[in-house]
Amino acid sequence: MKVVHQRYVAHSDAHYAGNLVDGAFGLKLFGDAGTHLAITVDGHESLFAGYSSVEFLAPVRGGDVVEAEARLASKGTRSRTVDFELRIICRSVDDTGRAEVLAEPIVATRARGTAVVPADAATPARCPSEAAPMAGRSGAGRPAR
């Protein structure tokens, strides 16, 4: 089971030389996608316990469009191991607003983390095995139509 959120990276999110966005930007998107996954799997937002690994593989810049994927790796009684991947799918070409859809996504960040649901909230999966991709700035987009 997985969920995917897509988001435009505003130029105002970049505050390092080279129009770079900090790594915490991607981790916040992982939190949103992970919460969505937990709601899909358990009907509860869950509590995030922490990351066991995080790899920053490529820079994210203002003007990019990224997608954050949260994929259920394993499910215990109350714990959920989640694999995350942040991919750049569009890239700003210059400072005039021109941009391009990338032929192949660039993997920017990978992580693995653990979420925990309260004992009274742990339930069997309630949704189909593959959730529809979601879009929206807040990560709370609507199902694709």
Task: List each language-model region with its residue ranges.
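Hydrophobic beta-strand-centered segment that forms part of the acyl-chain substrate-binding groove
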Residues: 34-75, 79-80, 94, 106
